Amino acid sequence: MGGRYDRNTFDEQDEVNPFANPGSVPAASNSRLSPLPPEPAGFGYGRTVDIPLDRPGSGAQDLKKKEKELQAKEADLRRREQDLKRKQDAAARAGIVIEAKNWPTFFPLIHHDIANEILVRLQRLQYIAFATYLGLVLALFWNIIAVTTAWIKGEGVTIWLLAVIYFISGVPGGYVLWYRPLYRAFRSDSAFNFGWFFLFYMLHILFCLFAAVAPPIVFKGKSLAGILPAIDVLSAQALVGIFYFIGFGLFCLESVVSIWVIQQVYMYFRGSGKADDMRRDAARGAMRAAI
């Protein structure tokens, strides 16, 4: 049994004085931790980092290159504008009007600019004439609807085919044969265009009057939504009769407005002296033909 002052095995054998000289401190003989190997004190500054740097002056060169490209494009656009202006001026001197398609705006099909190309005192009349063209389109389209109902009720497919033919021939025909000549006549005061308009607008009015009545000449008249077929089918098929009566009203309205338009155009034509010009042109043409 050990004594009171037996040596404690957990005590360090060498006592260290903390106030002793640091240079004379003995190394711990019983240290259980091995010191870490020394690390180089480079702090990462020794590694080379590749940073892509542009060459001096390359940014300025790119800017100059882009500036030259923009100047070249600008010069090309200016040259094209000048060429287009020269062509337009030459066409204007020759009496040729370049008609760019601008109507309808969502899908341009025709050139139409009453506000900028027609005289102010004639714009109202031109707008009403344009309304008669749109009225013809509406009447022919409704005619297809009315005849389609009659076909469904057992009237036969032939009248429907005729109604479609009226539409696909009347819509472009009305524009080419009488509306565009009137537009050009008001724009350039051309006696020839006035004469062309009067001829085919009269045929347009006669067709509308014929369609409003729809006499039983072709397939009992049921290919046109007029008053006579409306009365004929109303007792047996009320819906078809109502549709035909609506078509009759559209053709009547189209006829009345068209008669007013041709009267107003003729009054302007006589008052402007174009009638005399037309007679002189006709006499001159007859003289050339005789010679």
Swiss-Prot record:
Keywords: Cell membrane, Coiled coil, Cytoplasmic vesicle, Membrane, Phosphoprotein, Transmembrane, Transmembrane helix, Transport. Belongs to the SCAMP family. The chain crosses the membrane at residues 127-147, 159-179, 194-214, 242-262. Probably involved in membrane trafficking. Residues 58-94 form a coiled coil. It is a multi-pass membrane protein. It holds the Pfam family SCAMP. It comes from Arabidopsis thaliana (Mouse-ear cress). The modification Phosphoserine is found at S34. GO terms for cellular component: plasma membrane; transport vesicle membrane. This is Secretory carrier-associated membrane protein 5. Its main location: membrane. It is found in: Cell membrane; Cytoplasmic vesicle, Secretory vesicle membrane. Residues 1-10 have a biased composition (Basic and acidic residues). Residues 1-66 are annotated as: Disordered. Residues 1-126, 263-288 are cytoplasmic. GO terms for biological process: protein transport. The gene is SCAMP5. It comes from the Eukaryota. PANTHER family: SECRETORY CARRIER-ASSOCIATED MEMBRANE PROTEIN 5, SECRETORY CARRIER-ASSOCIATED MEMBRANE PROTEIN SCAMP. InterPro entries: SCAMP.
